[in-house]
Amino acid sequence: MIDPVFHRPQLAQQLADRILSDAPLAPARSGLFLAAPRRTGKSTFLREDLMPALIERGAAVLYVDLWADKALEPGQAIVSLVRSALAQEDSGLLKVFRKAGLEKVAVGGLDFDVAKVGLGTGITLAAALAELSDRLKAPIVLMIDEAQHAATTDGGNNALFALKAARDELNSSAHHGLRIVATGSSRPKLALLRASKDQAFFKAAMQTFPPLGRDYVEWFIANTGLSNSLDASRTETLFARTGSRPEVLVQALGELDDLVGSPQAKGAVDDQFEDAVNGAIAESDEAMLKAVRALTPLQGAVLRVMATQGEDYAPYAQKSLEAYAKQLAKIDPEAGVRIEIPNVQSALQALQAKSLAWRAAHGEYALEEQSLAELMKSRGLLD
């Protein structure tokens, strides 16, 4: 059976080395934050490559995607992760349990049958994970995908501080280590979790997740089923134009179904594929721009300032209020809207409701999709 997943084993090994380094001053001991745009293969890599590489080295791995169920409060999702991972017979943690020859695991003085392992009432996350790590004599790696959503609720923030306490305890000389790997689809939003001393993972290591490249393009071409192979260089250029998003290439390929297995003139398939990719990009761009065009003048002004200021955006700062007025005058000089904090608050709430803006629990705002700023700039909507 042909593997439907493109694998990145070398990258997985490199990150596994960094995550599991036992050097006392290894940056990953404080946490590793990986940022990459949404739909660029990050989550697939975590599940299909990095997780197996870590398990192969003896680590117990827990994984949760905070984007998977938007209705589930992020803090509860993290707690549920620990409980469900311990309870599932096929979880990486229980595999390590059995490999260690454990039939029962004692957590905080309480015995649980392996098939029914859970967190007992009154046992802190730090105490439970420390006891488990000690019994396994192995490090625990906790992967939190789309981790920025933890910052949107008080429960999520509390869970992060609980994990910080667990990290500090397990990374002491008395235990075997806890590594937190947090990923996010927006670098500015992910940065909020480690940019301030008031945050749980202040100054944790952060890096840009390497995008898919030529090797993915060649794998894609080899698996299209087309009689005439696509030109690798042209396809690579198209892939870069998509923002390195595999689903756009797959969508475009789906529009060439009538060509699969049929002989075509040299270059004809490439031309049609390029048209299909460009069409898919235009369709996606138009959907975002349509939402922008539907905004009120003040909402549009606030969105433009947010996109322009990026990580420095402070919604109620004097410089932002002045920037709103400037943008509003450009959008609609006759709008007749006063730039006052209550009006700005209403505009921000509307942008959040339209999924154009994202709000952290402590009041920070950022674009929901970072690519929107680049699109708006390309269309002359930003200074």
What do these predicted regions represent?
Residues 1-37, 44-53:
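Walker A/P-loop-proximal flanking segment of P-loop NTPase domains
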Residues 149-196, 209:
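Sensor-1/coupling segment of RecA-like P-loop NTPase cores
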Residues 282, 286-383:
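C-terminal leucine-rich, beta-strand-based interaction scaffolds used for sensing/assembly
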Residues 24-26, 54-56, 132-136, 168-176, ...:
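Conserved catalytic network of the ASCE P-loop NTPase/AAA+ motor domain
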Residues 192-237:
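Helix-loop-helix "sensor" segment of P-loop NTPases
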Residues 52, 255, 350-353:
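Alpha-helical DNA-recognition elements
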Residues 30-141, 147-156, 325-334:
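P-loop NTPase nucleotide-binding core
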Residues 222, 226-286, 297:
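Amphipathic alpha-helical "lid/sensor" segments that cap RecA-like P-loop NTPase cores
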